[in-house]
Amino acid sequence: MASPSKGNDLFSSDEEGPAMVAGPGPGPGGAEGAAEERRVKVSSLPFSVEALMSDKKPPKETSPRPAESASAGATLRPLLLPGHGVREAHSPGPLVKPFETASVKSENSEDGAAWMQEPGRYSPPPRHMSPTTCTLRKHKTNRKPRTPFTTSQLLALERKFRQKQYLSIAERAEFSSSLNLTETQVKIWFQNRRAKAKRLQEAELEKLKMAAKPMLPSGFSLPFPINSPLQAASLYGASYPFHRPVLPIPPVGLYATPVGYGMYHLS
């Protein structure tokens, strides 16, 4: 029959953990090994007194297995379409970007080559000018043809116009019937003839204005005749007791400047 101390050891060993029960039987050597193992575990803790006193760093954690890391990477990698995967496998991104920038730069250089050939000269690109179309005045489609007046009709109309430029309705009706014309034709002819007479009158007035303008400029006017030496002498103080001799006056045509600047030679 087992002693009570042995029973207590069995119960304590059951409480400590399954590692202690798994052995063949408790012995003095097994108990010492378990105590040493507990001391090692306690001393290996980073917050234990022994670890703080010894100032030892805890051992680094071992890296996970490569299979686990590969599986984690496979789970974290986003899903891609088949086309994307092939494109990434055959053409990496860093190699494509310089090629794209180089192609853009080459295109820009080709565009600017024509501008940089002659740096001292500005030559804008040629413009394609569209030919200018001559816009003519469009006549009305329902326009009536001009009335071909005969010579006798024109003479009668001119004679009537010199007598009276404005006809009343009764006079116009009577005159048009005598010439075998409509009232509208006579009315339009008189309107055109009055406009022509007005233009001729304005041209005559313009000719009269041009003829009335003096040939000499307006500032070239003399208040006295040049050939009268007495009036010229009176301007220079001839009434004083000491008279200046009157000098002969040269003709005015020899001077290009106005008369006041050198008409008289004073000594």
From Swiss-Prot:
<protein>
    <recommendedName>
        <fullName>Homeobox protein MSX-2</fullName>
    </recommendedName>
</protein>
<keyword id="KW-0371">Homeobox</keyword>
<feature type="region of interest" description="Disordered">
    <location>
        <begin position="1"/>
        <end position="74"/>
    </location>
</feature>
<keyword id="KW-0892">Osteogenesis</keyword>
<dbReference type="GO" id="GO:0000976">
    <property type="term" value="F:transcription cis-regulatory region binding"/>
</dbReference>
<dbReference type="GO" id="GO:0001649">
    <property type="term" value="P:osteoblast differentiation"/>
</dbReference>
<comment type="function">
    <text>Acts as a transcriptional regulator in bone development. Represses the ALPL promoter activity and antagonizes the stimulatory effect of DLX5 on ALPL expression during osteoblast differentiation. Probable morphogenetic role. May play a role in limb-pattern formation. In osteoblasts, suppresses transcription driven by the osteocalcin FGF response element (OCFRE). Binds to the homeodomain-response element of the ALPL promoter.</text>
</comment>
<dbReference type="InterPro" id="IPR020479">
    <property type="entry name" value="HD_metazoa"/>
</dbReference>
<dbReference type="Pfam" id="PF00046">
    <property type="entry name" value="Homeodomain"/>
</dbReference>
<dbReference type="GO" id="GO:0000122">
    <property type="term" value="P:negative regulation of transcription by RNA polymerase II"/>
</dbReference>
<dbReference type="GO" id="GO:0006357">
    <property type="term" value="P:regulation of transcription by RNA polymerase II"/>
</dbReference>
<dbReference type="InterPro" id="IPR009057">
    <property type="entry name" value="Homeodomain-like_sf"/>
</dbReference>
<dbReference type="GO" id="GO:0000977">
    <property type="term" value="F:RNA polymerase II transcription regulatory region sequence-specific DNA binding"/>
</dbReference>
<comment type="similarity">
    <text>Belongs to the Msh homeobox family.</text>
</comment>
<keyword id="KW-0238">DNA-binding</keyword>
<feature type="region of interest" description="Disordered">
    <location>
        <begin position="105"/>
        <end position="147"/>
    </location>
</feature>
<dbReference type="InterPro" id="IPR017970">
    <property type="entry name" value="Homeobox_CS"/>
</dbReference>
<keyword id="KW-0805">Transcription regulation</keyword>
<feature type="compositionally biased region" description="Basic and acidic residues">
    <location>
        <begin position="53"/>
        <end position="63"/>
    </location>
</feature>
<keyword id="KW-0678">Repressor</keyword>
<keyword id="KW-0539">Nucleus</keyword>
<dbReference type="InterPro" id="IPR001356">
    <property type="entry name" value="HD"/>
</dbReference>
<dbReference type="InterPro" id="IPR050674">
    <property type="entry name" value="Msh_Homeobox_Regulators"/>
</dbReference>
<dbReference type="GO" id="GO:0045892">
    <property type="term" value="P:negative regulation of DNA-templated transcription"/>
</dbReference>
<keyword id="KW-0217">Developmental protein</keyword>
<comment type="subunit">
    <text>Interacts with MINT, with XRCC6 (Ku70) and XRCC5 (Ku80).</text>
</comment>
<dbReference type="GO" id="GO:0048598">
    <property type="term" value="P:embryonic morphogenesis"/>
</dbReference>
<feature type="DNA-binding region" description="Homeobox">
    <location>
        <begin position="142"/>
        <end position="201"/>
    </location>
</feature>
<keyword id="KW-0804">Transcription</keyword>
<feature type="compositionally biased region" description="Basic residues">
    <location>
        <begin position="136"/>
        <end position="146"/>
    </location>
</feature>
<dbReference type="GO" id="GO:0005634">
    <property type="term" value="C:nucleus"/>
</dbReference>
<dbReference type="GO" id="GO:0000981">
    <property type="term" value="F:DNA-binding transcription factor activity, RNA polymerase II-specific"/>
</dbReference>
